[in-house]
Amino acid sequence: MQNMVILGATGSIGASTLSVISANPDAYRVYALVANASVDKMLALCVTHRPQVAHMVDSQAALALQAKLPPELNIQVTSGEDELIALVTATEVDTVMAAIVGAAGLVPTLAAVKAGKRVLLANKEALVMSGELFIEATKASGATLLPVDSEHNAIFQCLPEEVQANLGRCDLAASGISHILLTGSGGPFLTAELASLASMTPAQACKHPNWSMGPKISVDSATMMNKGLEFIEARWLFNTQKDQLKVVIHPQSVIHSMVQYRDGSVIAQMGNPDMRTPIAHCMSYPQRIRSGVEPLDFFKVGQLSFCEPDFNRFPCLALAIAACAQGQEATTVLNAANEIAVEAFLQGQIGFTHIAKVNEACLSSVPKRAMTSIDDIIALDAQTRIYAREQLAKFA
């Protein structure tokens, strides 16, 4: 029986994780649920899953949850960063699902890694912001790191065991790997007229053709910044060198990524676009459990198509690839800028095409400095957010 902490319990990954746990009740126990401020959602989850601890990042939300929880459930409600770190590092905890969206997930995820936990990584920003520090912490603590993102999980499944066992430190070429093919659907605007992108609304951007996701990730998919962040994450997870990582547009989202070997072989991982599949894989690795996902029906799949990304249509993807080549400081800046820009777009403050412009302005103007600690990363993140908010006024 694995005791699990779910960071981001009220989000889409949290919901999928709890669904997999419910399908395998003899193997997993919800030790703690963590959310930001969604009191009613957390209350419902507590009643259903009976965790030992419910943690709310927002202190007022914690008080509201405490007042609403039936006392007979005997659930401890906590709040505060120190309490959260204590929770993910507790000796009772075996596995941490790291699914808090954005930079907010970095500190608790890194704490779980340093404590040597089995970390299921759905928070791509942790590696985007602190890749080298994160990988070194994993190595030092002996933590088990398993990628939840459908693409990275697909790549992981297509790799040899010696690479799987050495994430972040592997040598792809020595294992006969030519390159990794990171697939992406292209989002809802893949075939839209370029001239129409400036007028696209948040509702349109959030209508992904294949996946069910939260608003921030949905917008990132529409700009393909999501694929850009995944590109950066893959660079750290799989220790890719120049030209070992390529992005391929695959609109059907049936092939979740591929690995091409030196002998010309290509191994692909396929399945219905449902996050419960990679979540179940990570939870049970190296075994297999029920995910609740229907098996892929090849007679209904139809045509599978592929194309190169159009960087005129997806400038955010180009920015992410360029930032990855520049290094850790640039990717930290880009991530912070993008979070501010996407939130502004979702609130109707800027247009869809302004997201890339805010990102580009920050990437070119925010001073980069060497980062040797988590405090350095947080400081650069904060500095970038201030500059990004200043840029918003230019596009309002």
UniProtKB/Swiss-Prot annotation:
For this entry, list what GO says about its biological process: isopentenyl diphosphate biosynthetic process, methylerythritol 4-phosphate pathway involved in terpenoid biosynthetic process
Q: Where does 1-deoxy-D-xylulose 5-phosphate bind?
A: 124, 150-151, 185, 208, 221, 226-227, 230
Q: Molecular function terms in GO for this entry?
A: 1-deoxy-D-xylulose-5-phosphate reductoisomerase activity; manganese ion binding; NADPH binding
This protein's cofactor list reads:
Mg(2+); Mn(2+)
Question: What are the UniProt keywords, alphabetically?
Answer: Isoprene biosynthesis, Manganese, Metal-binding, NADP, Oxidoreductase
Q: Where does Mn(2+) bind?
A: 149, 151, 230
**Pfam families per record:** DXP_redisom_C (PF08436), DXP_reductoisom (PF02670), DXPR_C (PF13288)
The pathway where this protein functions is: Isoprenoid biosynthesis; isopentenyl diphosphate biosynthesis via DXP pathway; isopentenyl diphosphate from 1-deoxy-D-xylulose 5-phosphate: step 1/6
The record describes the protein's role as: Catalyzes the NADPH-dependent rearrangement and reduction of 1-deoxy-D-xylulose-5-phosphate (DXP) to 2-C-methyl-D-erythritol 4-phosphate (MEP).
State the protein's name.
1-deoxy-D-xylulose 5-phosphate reductoisomerase
Which source organism? Answer: Shewanella sp. (strain ANA-3)
